[in-house]
Structures are given as C-alpha cells and as structure tokens.
C-alpha cells in the first residue's frame, strides 16, 4: 500500500472492490452527468474492456473524442471518470490546447531540446504522466492545437508511449485519453430538419444530428487522427428535465456546504429549483448559466441573510418562493 501511494500505481490487480466499481461504472457516472446516457454507455464499455485486460497491451486503456456544445458535461464526465476509475478527481491531467497553438509549443509538451532554456525541467505533459501513470488525460478544445501537436498525439494513440527531450520513455498504456471539441456544436443546437413534422423519433433525430456533426469533424481533423480514436461520442443538448436534475445536484452541494461550514440545515423546496430553471436556463449555453443562477439567487441571498443576522449559525432554514423571489424562513 505504501508503494502504491508513492508511485501512484494501483498495485492490486482487479481485486474485489475494483471489479465492483467497474460493474457500477455507468451508474456512478450517471449520478454526476445528467442526460448523456449514450456517452456514458460507450465510455464505460470501453473502460471495462481496457481494465479487465482485453485491450491491446501497447495502447492506452481508451481514447475518446467528445463532441458537443458548451456546458453539456464533456469536462464533467472526464472528472467523474477519473474519480470512478482511480478513486480521485485529482487523477485527471488537464491539458488546455489553446496553449499549444504555435509550432514551437510542441517543446512545451515533451520538453525543450538540449541547449535550450528549460531542458532540465522536462515537458508539461510528459512529466505529469511520468509521475502519475494511472490517470485520465483531458485534451481540452483539441481543434485549437497546432498540427505538429497532433503528430505527438498520433504516436501516443498508436504506440502508447512518447520519448521526452531527455530520452526517457513515458508510458501512456494505463491512461484514458479524452479529447473534447466544440466542432459541429451548431449542428447539435440547431439540427437541420425537413418538412413540418416536429414530433419526430428521438433516435432518428440523434442519428441525423450525429451525421451532420461527423461531416464537420472530418473536414477539421486529419483522417489518420480520427482513425486511431476508439470512440467518437456526440453529446446531446440538455432539455428541461435535465436542467431540473442539474439544479437539484447544485442545490445539494449548497446544502452540504451550509451544513459543513455553517452548521445550518438548509431545505430547498422544489419550487425554488423550478424558479431557478425558469429564470436562469439557456439551452445554447447548457448547464453553466444554471450555476451562475444558483450563485446569484440562492447563495448570495443566503450570504446577505447571514450578514444581516436574519439567519444564525446552527439554524434550520427553509428556502421557498414568495412573489417570484426566493425567501428564507427559519
């Protein structure tokens, strides 16, 4: 166990607790990421295959391209996977691809060549993976990266390793590689429809939307890159039911924080959640405006009530709606 803590390598192979965790992987992910059943199913199947030991031993556990509009849960799913697989959200290495837009930024990834400044430090990506070989690597907004950066990714996806500037081999075989992109987001938010039939079959709708997105993706990425990815997953835009569930999760977090930090037992009524969805949701921007709405309408008002002395530490507080505003009763 001590060695496992030092090296960050789970020493025990598929033991009982991990097989139980893998069995429930899709259920665990569904608790955190709302309204993306297809994405969760595809992801958990590939991860189960990889962790059981059926994958190609020379390649990463899985490589995925997540496509979808902003705020639908692409990054959240990566965090949830890191926590479900390796037991900690910290085991996600996030690489923001907007930092790798220039040609010379390749050296930032694997380290500067000998004689250049920073040669001793190693690369930003290679060092992180070397120190944390069991992790989820998230390449955020992959379409922004320079073509030379893609060449490094091709090697990782194919051979499962890269050699850094100091000649050390960095092993990617125990990582899950996730790339996110907003390519084709317009086709997801505003799918092209023919005729007047509004109530269409959802599955047919999703298939058509996926085909439109894939057309755009094929123009944007090189075929040899797309060919090496295990699964390309298209995320759904969020509907009103999803929004309500997401607000429910966010309110749960506020309730937990109030209990832990202020010893306040806070009860948030359904009418409050409904009010936040009605006033704060925007389909184009997904779940992010909801977090802002929860902050401004619930957290800010609770903070003001605490400062004014209306609510004291250790109180039992109920949040409800009165005259289209959130009010607290003690």
State what each model feature region is:
Residues 1-330:
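AAA+ P-loop NTPase nucleotide-binding core of proteostasis motors
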């Amino acid at each position: 166990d001590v060695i496992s803590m030092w090296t960050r390598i789970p020493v025990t192979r598929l033991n009982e607790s991990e097989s139980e965790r893998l069995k429930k992987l899709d259920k665990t992910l569904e608790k955190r990421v709302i309204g993306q059943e297809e994405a969760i199913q595809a992801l958990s199947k590939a991860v189960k295959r990889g962790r059981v030991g059926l994958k190609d031993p020379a390649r990463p556990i899985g490589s995925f391209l997540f496509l979808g509009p902003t705020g639908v849960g692409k990054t959240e799913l990566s965090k949830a996977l890191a926590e479900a697989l390796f037991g900690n959200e910290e085991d996600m290495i996030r690489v923001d691809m907007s930092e790798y837009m220039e040609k010379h930024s390749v050296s930032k990834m694997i380290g500067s060549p000998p004689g250049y400044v920073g040669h001793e430090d190693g690369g930003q990506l290679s060092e992180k993976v070397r120190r944390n070989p069991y992790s989820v690597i998230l390449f955020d907004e992959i379409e922004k990266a320079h073509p030379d950066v893609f060449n490094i990714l091709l090697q990782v996806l194919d051979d499962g390793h890269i050699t850094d500037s100091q000649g050390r081999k960095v092993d990617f075989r125990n990582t899950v590689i996730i790339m996110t992109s907003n390519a084709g987001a317009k086709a997801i938010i505003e799918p092209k429809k023919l005729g007047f039939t509004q109530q269409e079959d959802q599955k047919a709708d999703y298939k058509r939307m996926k085909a439109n997105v894939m057309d755009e993706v094929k123009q944007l990425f090189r075929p040899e890159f797309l060919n090496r990815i295990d699964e390309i997953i298209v995320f759904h835009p969020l509907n009103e039911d999803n929004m309500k569930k997401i607000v429910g999760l966010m309110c749960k977090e506020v309730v937990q924080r109030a209990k832990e930090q202020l010893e306040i037992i806070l009860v948030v009524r359904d009418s409050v959640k409904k009010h936040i969805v009605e006033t704060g949701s925007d389909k184009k921007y997904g779940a992010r405006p909801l977090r802002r709405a929860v902050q401004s309408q619930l957290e800010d008002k609770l903070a003001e009530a605490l400062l004014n002395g209306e609510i004291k530490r250790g109180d039992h507080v109920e949040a409800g709606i009165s005259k289209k505003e959130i009010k607290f009763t003690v």
